[in-house]
């Protein structure tokens, strides 16, 4: 909610007349490969309307650090104990559950730590998905030292010298 370029963007109404975050959560709920959808947001007071809204919708909410998003994800994962984490940002109301499922399948079928469709990006903006193991997240949480790595969650995990990664490539570069 604290975006400097577009404040409160996740609570802005989208074409369906619902807040953007609700559209994202509804679409993610259509995934056949995602067992649980959790909003991981910060403890900043300006996020309370978002937290209350998502809680009222019946989704789990985890609150953590505003700046250290890697820590927020790690602490959420500790609480919910997933085998893998699927990361979708809250400003992607057109996220396609079929693309999410394809990324999870790629993760499950290959012996990898990290799968995404963003390295290089061949899908349209707004369809970004990342899937990574809890163990890779834990290593990143322990070893990542730069502010950039801690603020952006996955740059450390995308290190191909340390982790096995795969990129999901769209058949037509959009």
Which residues are covered by each model-predicted region?
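Short acidic donor-binding/metal-coordinating loop in glycosyltransferase active sites
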Residues: 42, 65, 90-92
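N-terminal glycine-rich phosphate-binding loop and ensuing alpha1 helix
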Residues: 1-41, 45-48
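Conserved donor nucleotide-binding strand/loop of the catalytic core
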Residues: 55-67
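Conserved donor-nucleotide/metal-binding helix-loop-beta segment in metal-dependent transferases, i.e.
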Residues: 75, 80, 92, 96-122
